[in-house]
Amino acid sequence: VTSTKWPVKDDFIFSASMKINNYFLNDQVSFGLMVRDDMYIDKVTPDILGDYVAAAPLLLTHENAPANCFARKSGKLVYGGTCTRGYKPGETVKVQIESTSDGYACTFGDETTITGGFDFKLTALDPENVYLCMFAARNADVTFSDVRLDIK
């Protein structure tokens, strides 16, 4: 995980190209961009901490219909929608998270931009900042390029 602390009052567009090099097929593998309300690095805890939105697929075992973006709000996982197809190693996709007046808009590849269910500001744990991240979880190998953080 690579992250940047960002003032919550400053609207942004966070985007990148992401090459999917390889991944182990299970429902917890994911990769993309994330915005969180707090960041935990090298912290061991049994608690599920923090809320987030992710411009990323999930449930990759659902071959042609993985989840299109996801979020965690008040400890509950929320799926943004369903992808129109599966994503395979060797593909390069665009990913983007844009702050909006009431939350975030997440886009993964050519899929529909997700805003519904992502209408919260991520200020529960840190009311001043959010944390913008690039991530690959659970045996995923991706390469990010053309990473941009634009102020709106």
How would you name each of these model-derived features?
Residues 1-70:
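Secretory/extracellular carbohydrate-interaction modules
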Residues 1-6, 80-86, 120-122, 133-134:
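Beta-strand-rich interaction surfaces with strong enrichment in secreted/lumenal proteins
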Residues 14-16, 90-99, 104-108:
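Short tryptophan-centered beta-strand motifs in secreted/extracellular beta-sheet-rich domains
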Residues 41-43, 78-81, 112-118:
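Surface-exposed loop/edge segments in extracytoplasmic proteins
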Residues 65-67, 77, 104-105:
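Hydrophobic residues embedded in beta-strands of well-ordered beta-sheets
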Residues 72-94:
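Short, aromatic/His-centered strand-loop micro-motif at the edge of beta-sheets
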Residues 117-143:
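Flexible glycan-contacting loops in extracellular carbohydrate-active proteins
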Residues 144-149:
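Extracellular beta-strand elements of beta-rich domains used
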